[in-house]
Amino acid sequence: MTNPIYDCVINKKTTQKPIWFMRQAGRYLPEFRKIRKLNPNFINLCLNKNLSAEITLQPLKRFDLSAAIIFSDILMVPYGLHQNVSFKKNFGPALGDISLDNLLNIKKEEFITKLKPIYNCIKKVKSNKIMKNKNLIGFVGAPWTLLVYMINKKSPKNKISNNFFDNKNLINGILNKLEEFLKIHIENQINNGADVIQIFDSWAGLIDKKDLANYAYLPTLNLVNFIKSKNVPVICFPRGIKNYKEYSEFVKPDAISIDYKVDPHKIKKEIKIPVQGGLNPNILLSDKETIKKEALNYLNLFK
């Protein structure tokens, strides 16, 4: 099979730019909304091999995309570590209390067993004929972002609590455990068919400049090196990070994702690796010609 993302980010061949959406499977598709209505428990939906595979493939049945993104969630890792995780309407993720002692005693086999349906889903998607000459993107949350959810027990929105760093033993213990089990989760995704891994650091923008190395750069660098050792491309999305140039030079992903609040001209000047994303999603509410014009302008900017 051809490998459009690998060719782009590793071999630096750009004759065919790979195209996919960051939130590819989801509410904009009526076929997804139909499944979601019948399956209100989001965690159970992620653990349903057949339904999650169907959702993963839905966008590719409509659009000629270069890749499928496995239908899952970054919070499946805390779930695998026996933290209660649920998604509440008009609230978002809600996580239960966490005990470091309990966390330290979790065995690799327990974790893999809890997340086995995800790996089976990857295998099922990969074997589908639609995936011929398509990539399959697996993903994880960065250690910092998962730490924020696990301690904060909900979405931090735009800030973390003043006492977040009070218990350094808890923070360091969770980070160490997360690195260990994120590698397990990544390896199982790769072994079952993921061609690319993306690391989402959704709350990187909440880290003070003085703490970036300890909480954003180093933990993610360890994962990046692990993924590269498997000869698999890795894309990082440090949303809101204060210095994309410093991040890309320290963490060394194969490609980097940006959001629409970032100045693309600055990114083009400073970043020397492939860039994904950055187009304002509000453009999709415009007419067809405007969407086409904006997309082409954005592509031409990075030529």
Model regions and ranges:
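Active-site-proximal, glycine-rich beta->alpha crossover segments in alpha/beta enzymes
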Residues: 86-188
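Hydrophobic faces of well-ordered beta-strands that scaffold small-molecule active sites
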Residues: 15-23, 67-70, 136-140, 197-199, ...
